């Protein structure tokens, strides 16, 4: 049996390294439990990390204007940074990895894309699926600032893709 497991790992290394976390919930369930929630703009990225400009700290403490956020691949349960193009804005719920770096997880909805004056993602939906929601950005920012006290009323808008 051990030989079969080893053979499988050698022949399919991607499968052996796949993320195994379960989706723990929408933005409204996971965001307030993180170290830092920011409104940010992506400056640049390389293979597995991105530099973001902090436009506003919504929750937590961060004095730097530019921070590093780790992305990843299928093996480390972090999203590929290619999904965050330079120049785009996001509401990011981040976990501190060390004194200088934050991490972003795929194990819940830890980011919302900013599209004009709207925030888009899985905001309140209790199950992971193709449907995304949209809410006024000002309402989402207010919700985070209030510690989840203010009301959010997102609406379903689109499919998340293939």
Task: List the predicted regions and their residue ranges.
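Extracellular secreted precursors and ectodomains with disulfide-bonded cysteine-rich loops/domains
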Residues: 17-19, 75, 105
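Short boundary/loop segments of OB/S1/cold-shock single-stranded nucleic-acid-binding domains
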Residues: 19-34
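Short secondary-structure capping/turn segments at boundaries of alpha-helices and beta-strands
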Residues: 24-28, 39, 78
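Positively charged n-region of N-terminal signal peptides that target proteins for export
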Residues: 1-4
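N-terminal signal peptide c-region/cleavage motif recognized by signal peptidases
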Residues: 13-15
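Netrin-like (NTR/C345C) domain of secreted extracellular proteins
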Residues: 77-162
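OB-fold (S1/OB) nucleic-acid-binding surfaces
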Residues: 48-71
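Structural detector for short beta-strands of small beta-barrel domains
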Residues: 33-55
